Amino acid sequence: ITKMEISEKPKRPESNREYLTLDEVKRLMRTSCGNEMVKRAFLFSCFTGLRLSDIEALTWDRIRDSGKGMQVESTQIKTGKAVYVPLSSNALAQLPERGRGRVFHLPVRYTMGEILANWVKRAGITKHITYHCSRHTYATLLLTFGANLYTVSALLGHTDISTTQIYAKIVDENKRKTVDLIPDIGER
């Protein structure tokens, strides 16, 4: 078997990266979830970009004062890469009362998926939202509000900037849609 040249390898189709807008995040914050810990964990991920596996493993000793504010210092389960994520006031507001051991005590993933789907529906959001969409939400919100692509990439723990550029493309598409909201007035 011979190795394929990079140019010969079939390209994977870009997946649809569903995310929440800021208004949708606010709507979820105002809507009862049915499980307060699932609600807090999901919103915490919307404000930190942490994957579900990292949220499930997050312990209180990983949340520390850096001298410039609170941050999560953790090793990503998926990649083994160390990440340092400063915590905004929005993220801090989602933390449960400080204790020992794990920060978020969550149900099994299947149950959590059902809770999340029902919560999103109750909030009147018609998108197909999974837990991982919280990570997409974080990246998209940061870029929408002017964050540097390289900083977002570092916060997400991406090893390749092209992974983060997918979110920049989403933001660019939203800019086009927004500009097109002004109807053509027909006069030149």
PLM region descriptions:
Residues 62-69, 126, 147-166, 177:
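Short, polar N-cap/turn motifs at the start of nucleic acid-interacting alpha helices
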Residues 182-188:
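C-terminal secondary-structure termini that scaffold catalytic or DNA-interacting sites
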Residues 19, 76-80, 109, 156, ...:
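Catalytic-site neighborhood detector that most strongly recognizes the C-terminal catalytic loop/helix
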Residues 43, 47, 53-54, 118, ...:
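C-terminal catalytic core of tyrosine-transesterase DNA break-rejoin enzymes
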Residues 86-126:
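Active-site/catalytic core of tyrosine-dependent DNA strand-transfer enzymes
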Residues 25, 37-39, 109, 113, ...:
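Short, leucine-enriched amphipathic alpha-helices that occur as contiguous helical runs
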Residues 2-52, 56, 78, 185:
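Basic, Lys/Arg- and aromatic-enriched nucleic-acid-binding interface segment
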Residues 131-132:
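Catalytic tyrosine of NAD(P)H-dependent dehydrogenase/reductases that use a Tyr as the general acid/base
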